[in-house]
């Protein structure tokens, strides 16, 4: 049902946030479903027409599928070409999915291919992200490269419908966490915030240990 709803233009929403709050917006862009030419035009328009300089590139669901459009690394190369033109500077990011196997190696490859930073999938558990950060640090030290910045993503909810939407998006929510958050409809918002803050505290403790 979500896929059938009319979606707003994310760049327009990003521009509204920038104008209203005064902070730079980050817009996600799936790269694989349209040609390199279309993607390049979209990147240029995002910068020139919407004033958005931060784009997170999102690839396909499987490396076994032959997609029409460019990969994340190929898209970052397109952005590098755009950035070579006077007056254009797009900061190019990628997605980190902590629950995915050997994600640290994917981050290393994408970082070497031009990705400047990563945003995580929405976090409702600290175990996978802590492991991923540790593994990523290890592989970067082994390869003698500097780790890229990783931005942690949180999306507290206020209703069970919000939670179901996150699950539809593929967010990993442990069963025990879901049961705790939804045990009482009147406390979903508070418990969701509590879980998000707990995950952040756990990750910060892991990093500093």
What are the functions of these language-model segments?
Residues 1-102, 185, 194, 209:
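Active-site beta->alpha loop and helix N-cap motifs at the rims of alpha/beta catalytic domains
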Residues 32-38, 69-73, 121-135, 156-158:
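Active-site glycine- and acidic-residue-rich loops that bind
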Residues 46-47, 110, 114, 152:
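Conserved, mostly hydrophobic/aromatic
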Residues 54-63, 112-128, 209:
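Glycine-rich phosphate-binding active-site loops on the catalytic face of alpha/beta enzymes
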Residues 79-80, 129-140, 201-204:
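Short, well-ordered amphipathic alpha-helices
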Residues 145-208:
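Catalytic-face loop-and-helix region of soluble metabolic enzyme cores
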């Amino acid at each position: 049902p979500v896929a059938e709803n009319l979606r707003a233009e994310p760049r327009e929403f990003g521009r509204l946030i920038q104008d209203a709050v005064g902070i730079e917006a980050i817009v996600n862009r799936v790269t694989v479903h349209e040609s390199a030419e279309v993607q390049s035009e979209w990147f240029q328009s995002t910068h020139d027409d919407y004033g958005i300089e931060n784009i997170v590139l999102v690839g396909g669901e499987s490396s076994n599928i032959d997609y029409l459009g460019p990969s994340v690394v190929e898209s970052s190369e397109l952005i590098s070409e755009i950035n070579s033109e006077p007056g254009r500077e797009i900061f190019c990011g990628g997605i980190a999915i902590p629950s995915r196997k050997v994600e640290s190696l994917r981050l290393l490859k994408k970082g070497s291919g031009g990705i400047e930073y990563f945003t995580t999938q929405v976090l409702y558990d600290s175990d996978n992200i802590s492991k991923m950060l540790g593994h990523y640090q290890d592989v970067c030290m082994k390869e003698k490269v500097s780790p890229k910045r990783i931005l942690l993503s949180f999306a507290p909810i206020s209703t069970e419908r919000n939670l179901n939407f996150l699950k539809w998006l593929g967010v990993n929510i442990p069963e025990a966490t879901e049961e705790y958050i939804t045990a009482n409809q009147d406390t979903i918002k508070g418990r969701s915030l509590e879980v998000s803050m707990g995950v952040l505290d756990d990750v910060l403790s892991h990093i500093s240990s």
